Amino acid sequence: MNKAIFLSDFNQNSTPRDPFVFYHDGYFYHLFAMNDALYLRRSAELEDLKDAKSKMVYHDDKFHEVWAPELHIINDKCYIYVAMDDGNNYNHRMYVLENNSNDPMVPYVLHGQIKEKNERWAIDGSILYHGGKMYFTWSGWEGLENVCQNIYIQEMSDPFTLIGERTMISTPEYEWEKRGCEGGNNRPYINEGPFAIYGKNKLHIVYSGSGSWSDDYCLGVITFEGGDILDKNNWKKHPTPILSRTETALGPGHASFFEDPRNGKKYFTYHLFDTDAKNGWQGTHAMIQEYEMVDDFPVLPKPVNHFIDK
């Protein structure tokens, strides 16, 4: 289970930030944002994904700071959920793209913004299913100030539309969720990158805590305990991170999870710093590793630095 697969770095004609990998119709796909555009690449074998040719599937000059895209196939059609702004971070919102196809490589067009009635800052949107309904989860601000990012959930009536009210289900509480943060000065407390994992009888959301600009970026998890999924009291936060730094693998975070249906193996992909945070977000790469569900809870191996942990 400890085998690590190198996915990408900034020398691979791709970006390692916020990696998203999925399997569909015989191929593994890697979706990423680079230079304010979205790209996909695919390969039949996971180990070959790093060398696959990239194809641009979306670009619009009016959007900037294009972050953390995810591709979800809903009713046999492909949708990309992505955070974008107009060049001002305060205007980051979630958008949905579509290509009217079940082929992920077909170019996408903008359907529109995922509109939440409070019109608050929003990034890192993802899809969650429970009880025959579809929900949207994301990282956002409670108010208008960049002091704290929380995890929210809200029901969807279709791939484009939120209904009802948003519910905050996680906010930074523990010391390990607040490292590198100030609660202001563009260093907000961080809960971001929510991603659902489905156990046999449990639903979990894995998220990232602490500053993504710090060596202490890590993964935490909240677990749905049953009842109303939109009641924050029905979500329980695990008191310790499930993935955190080692002496050589610093700042591991923003993960996505997927399965190889051919053999049932479970994988996650994440980014981390090449050396340390002093080189900023440019000095990062992405890895893929196997994980296990033990007693219906995600158990992740230690992160691996491709350039150091030989």
PLM-predicted stretches and their roles:
Residues 1-310:
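Carbohydrate-active catalytic/glycan-binding domains of CAZyme proteins
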